Curated annotation (Swiss-Prot):
Name of the top EC class for this enzyme: hydrolase
InterPro entries for this protein: GTP-CH-I_C/QueF (IPR043133), GTP-CH-I_N (IPR043134), GTP_CycHdrlase_I (IPR001474), GTP_CycHdrlase_I_CS (IPR018234), GTP_CycHdrlase_I_dom (IPR020602)
Name of protein: GTP cyclohydrolase 1
EC number of this enzyme: 3.5.4.16
Entry superkingdom: Bacteria
Entries under Pfam families matching the protein: GTP_cyclohydroI
Cellular component terms (Gene Ontology): cytoplasm
MF terms (GO), sorted A to Z: GTP binding; GTP cyclohydrolase I activity; zinc ion binding
Family, similarity comment: Belongs to the GTP cyclohydrolase I family.
Species whose genome carries this gene: Mycobacterium tuberculosis (strain ATCC 25177 / H37Ra)
Pathway: Cofactor biosynthesis; 7,8-dihydroneopterin triphosphate biosynthesis; 7,8-dihydroneopterin triphosphate from GTP: step 1/1
Length: 202
């Protein structure tokens, strides 16, 4: 199955269960030895549940709806959006990883492009799910290939993982870089090198 995410089909029918989330947070507070009824924690289950609803909003949005606006610009060269701020949640520890995404594509033969803000929204949608960085990178690339039918797509994500910074090996400042290349960027070394040069150029 494509990395495009088998969960997409169910995104339209998922509903966040606020009550169940609050009960789970309350149980977690008991599990760590806290009293969820004390003043400082009495509203915490509700707050955490609402936060999770926002942090995982991408589970309840159909990716196709994000890329539903296209323009006939007859453009046949690279379109690159750099330094898109990105916040996601590691699915292994449910703590944040954050950084930037660089997303580029070469339009297909029809020259159609999508709005630049749509690319940022697509990054945000897939980031707002329990994730691993490798899959996140591929999902963004595959979604663009499916919807835009471009000649090529390149996605590079640079992120710091708090599961490495605040626990475990405790290496704050470590940056993980992942890439996904599709179409022309996979088969043509010159096109790939040009895109990477533009991405890495500060």
């Amino acid at each position: 199955m494509s990395q495009l995410d088998s969960r997409s089909a169910s995104a339209r029918i998922r509903v966040f269960d606020q009550q169940r989330a609050e009960a789970a947070v309350r149980e977690l507070l008991y599990a760590i030895g806290e009293d969820p009824d004390r003043d400082g924690l009495v509203a915490t289950p509700s707050r955490v549940a609402r936060s999770y609803r926002e942090m995982f909003a991408g589970l309840y949005t159909d990716p196709d709806s994000v890329l539903n606006t296209m323009f006939d610009e007859d453009h046949d060269e690279l379109v690159l959006v750099k330094e898109i701020p990105m916040y996601s949640t590691c699915e292994h520890h449910l703590v944040a990883f954050h950084g930037v995404a660089h997303v580029g594509y070469i339009p297909g033969d029809d020259g159609r492009v999508t709005g630049l803000s749509k690319i940022a929204r697509l990054v945000d949608l897939y980031a707002k799910r329990p994730q691993v960085q490798e899959r996140l990178t591929s999902q963004i690339a595959d979604a663009l290939m499916k919807k835009l039918d471009p000649r090529g797509v390149i996605v590079v994500i640079e992120a710091e993982h708090l599961c490495m910074a605040m626990r475990g090996v405790r290496k704050p400042g470590s940056v993980t870089t992942t890439s996904a290349v599709r179409g022309l960027f996979k088969t043509n070394a010159a096109s790939r090198a040009e895109a990477l040069d533009l991405i890495l150029r500060k």
